[in-house]
UniProtKB/Swiss-Prot annotation:
Residues in Thyroglobulin type-1 domain copies: 34-95, 102-163, 167-231
PANTHER family attached to this UniProt entry: NIDOGEN-2, SECRETED MODULAR CALCIUM-BINDING PROTEIN
Organism of this sequence: Actinia equina (Beadlet anemone)
Compartments where found: Secreted
UniProt name for this protein: Equistatin
Function: Potent inhibitor of papain-like cysteine proteinases (Ki=0.18-0.57 nM on papain), as well as of the aspartic proteinase cathepsin D (Ki=0.3-05 nM).
Record family assignment: Belongs to the protease inhibitor I31 family.
SMART domains in UniProt: TY
GO CC, any one term: extracellular space
Length: 231
């Protein structure tokens, strides 16, 4: 028995609806099988050229280190792919230490925001220390800093300056002690090769040794005589 015109239209529409539902279910099933990282990766790959594309492991989880190739920046992420504050640098951060305590540079990087007229967050090395050269994105000025991130006077200029290693506080104190014209034996601080204070300081003429902090300040109660304390 031949189908009426209305029946034929209904039958055709029903078939189309079934196909639409089938395709929708297939797409939903495919998306459901993808991890969050893979979904974001697929979405980014279909977007603008040069956009950030998440890097995923073979298992679908986020790689601990994420990089944005067009900018040269890399950073560490948690299991949900969220950036761990203070880890973004130009180059390759050490994300095996991502749960370790942040360095001063990383903490400043995490809390300082880009404000017009300000230099913005500092640039940190892979080990978390300050880059010798810091630059202001707002005006293109760059300058040299010490190990604590403090600007070295006379180094600010347009473009990147050549930042030779300057004398540290410990090295300056050591030179000053050696140049003293008095014959009395002065205390001469002990410095490491990188210019930082040796945590154990001694005054040979008195026989005393003591512990100091990173700034060379004596730790109260650490004085001992005729031996080196454990600092």
């Amino acid at each position: 028995m031949a189908l009426s015109q209305n029946q034929a239209k209904f039958s055709k529409g029903f078939v189309v609806m079934i196909w639409v539902l089938f395709i929708a279910c297939a797409i939903t099933s495919t998306e459901a099988s993808l991890t969050k990282c893979q979904q974001l990766q697929a979405s980014a790959n279909s977007g603008l050229i040069g956009a950030y594309v998440p890097q995923c492991k073979e298992t679908g989880e986020f790689e601990e280190k994420q990089c944005w190739g067009s900018t040269g920046y890399c950073w560490c992420v948690d299991e949900d792919g969220k950036e761990i504050l203070g880890t973004k640098i130009r180059g390759s951060p050490d994300c095996s230490r991502r749960k370790a305590a942040l360095t001063l540079c990383q903490m400043m990087q995490a809390i300082i925001v880009n404000v017009p007229g300000w230099c913005g967050p500092p640039s940190c090395k892979a080990d978390g220390s300050f880059d010798e050269v810091q630059c202001c994105a707002s005006n293109g000025e760059c300058y040299c800093v010490d190990k604590k991130g403090k600007e070295l006077e006379g180094t600010r200029q347009q473009g990147r300056p050549t930042c030779e290693r300057h004398l540290s506080e410990c090295e300056e104190a050591r030179i000053k002690a050696h140049s003293n014209s008095l014959r009395v034996e002065m205390f001469v601080p002990e410095c490491f090769e990188d210019g930082s204070y040796n945590p154990v300081q001694c005054w040979p003429s008195t026989g005393y040794c003591w512990c100091v902090d990173e700034g060379g300040v004596k730790v109260p109660g650490s004085d001992v005589r005729f031996k080196r304390p454990t600092c």
